[in-house]
UniProtKB/Swiss-Prot annotation:
NCBIfam families in alphabetical order: pupylate_cterm
Encoding gene (name): pup
Keywords: Isopeptide bond, Ubl conjugation pathway
Residues found modified as Deamidated glutamine: 65
Name recorded for this polypeptide: Prokaryotic ubiquitin-like protein Pup
């Protein structure tokens, strides 16, 4: 059998630098969404602590939507 040689080429440094910036920008946007979600969940928790029975009745009347 003949010996096979394999060549491996590395990517250019410029492309890698651009790709590293993109996930960081996306992470910032994702953090904003999580913060909004946390605020909404805190509001729901507060409502349930004060008047859970009314919340459940209103949820059932709307058909769970």
């Amino acid at each position: 059998m003949a010996n096979a040689q394999q060549q491996v080429f590395g990517g250019g440094g410029g492309d890698d630098a651009e790709n590293n910036d993109a996930p960081q920008q996306g992470s910032g946007t994702q953090q904003v969404n999580v913060t909004g979600t946390d605020d909404l969940l805190d509001e729901i928790d507060g409502l349930l602590e004060t008047n859970a029975e009314e919340f459940v009745r209103s949820y059932v009347q709307k058909g769970g939507q």
